[in-house]
Amino acid sequence: KAKEAGITAVIASDQAVIMTARTIGIEVHISTQLNVTNIETVKFYAMFADTIVLSRELSLRQVKKITEDIEKEQVKGPSGNLVEIEIFGHGALCMAVSGKCYLSLHSHNSSANRGACKQNCRKKYTVIDQESGFEIEVDNEYLMSPKDLCTLDFLDQVIDSGIKVLKIEGRGRAADYVATVIKTYREAIDSYYEGTFTKEKINTWMEALATVYNRGFWSGYYLGQKLGEWSDNPGSNATQKK
């Protein structure tokens, strides 16, 4: 049905889905849920796909090493062209390593790897000392809820890492969110190539992004940060309310 509807490609992590899509002639993009973190894994999945979405836990230095190795070793996909690397640029982050969270599956029999995460990580939690039974005071009860990824203020470094596709969250988001985020990143990317990617413009774009749904922004792991940054509320920090 997807092929009949004219869908260009499917994002997949399950090997059976990947093989089925290839068999019926639908292009496959390898999902971040497969946790691709090195050139050897890229080589393997290059047998099935021309576009591979890397794990969200990599630094830009690691991303650049992979894109350079693709060029150096001429790693090609089914089309005969060099494999293209895609990374997440903006939106929600998982509290776990990409593709390795099973909280939703365990609690609700609803798998994140099948696009059905129940967002257990976005709830408030109480920390209990199991030996004494005492509750431990914590300054933020949203213990597993990461802030949203935002790469706009270092988008020049992202582009320079050699990626070909920037992935922006859209599923489950309102139309105003999608329109604002896509418009902002489109302007920023064009500005980079025009040589007008300035601090003043970045500040304006960041203000625009803050007007729509967000849990607060951070740079993810791209700039070498080892630990996550956590949201402090269950909803949006948007500067404009609907």
Sequence positions of predicted segments:
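N-terminal active-site wall of soluble small-molecule enzyme domains
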Residues: K1-F44
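Surface-exposed amphipathic alpha-helical tracts and adjacent flexible/coil segments at the periphery
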Residues: K1-K3, A12, E27, K43-A46, ...
